[in-house]
Amino acid sequence: MRIALLAVLALTLSGCATVQRYDAANDVHALLVSIRDNDRRVFEAHVDRPALKRQIESRLLAETRKAQPGDGLAALSILLSPVVADVAGDVLVQPRVFRAVADYYGYGPDTPIPNALVIGAQLKPAGDGRVCATRRKDGPCLLTFTQTAGTWRLSGFEGDLSMLRTKR
């Protein structure tokens, strides 16, 4: 009896993760369409701008601090980096910038975006009620989504920062 109860509990918990992934899939689909169509209104509804901006700024600052010590230009960069990172966070969080990320996933301008069932199967639980998108099933998270006020929003970007370009 105890083993059966543990098995049911394990299935229930794994089911929650599955439901979470498929719940997020509709919003991830809407985000992908907004990126493809450069639809700022829908993009903004599916992006946690403050969280994403903070995360991008943090990564930019970390990259700046990796500069060679004793380098005068590096010291100036470190001094100015919070201001530059703040501006970059504003400039980089927009649909046309994330088009390179969509291209990386194989969603070019002429590629049909898969339905929510396909997207849900590609998402994986990321802990703390978040889900993430990976390039391969066993690969690292590239995009992280968090549910806020009933909508799953892009809240983290773990990809190569060079993918976020303002000019094409």
Task: Name the predicted role of every residue range.
Residues M1-L9:
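Sec-dependent signal peptide recognition
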Residues T12-G15:
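C-terminal motif of bacterial Sec signal peptides marking the signal peptidase cleavage site
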Residues A17-Q20:
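Bacterial signal peptide processing site
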Residues A24-A45:
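Post-signal peptide N-terminal segment of mature Sec-exported envelope proteins
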Residues R40-V93, V97-F98:
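Early exported N-terminus immediately downstream of N-terminal targeting peptides
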Residues A85-R168:
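Exposed beta-sheet edge and beta->alpha loop/turn motif
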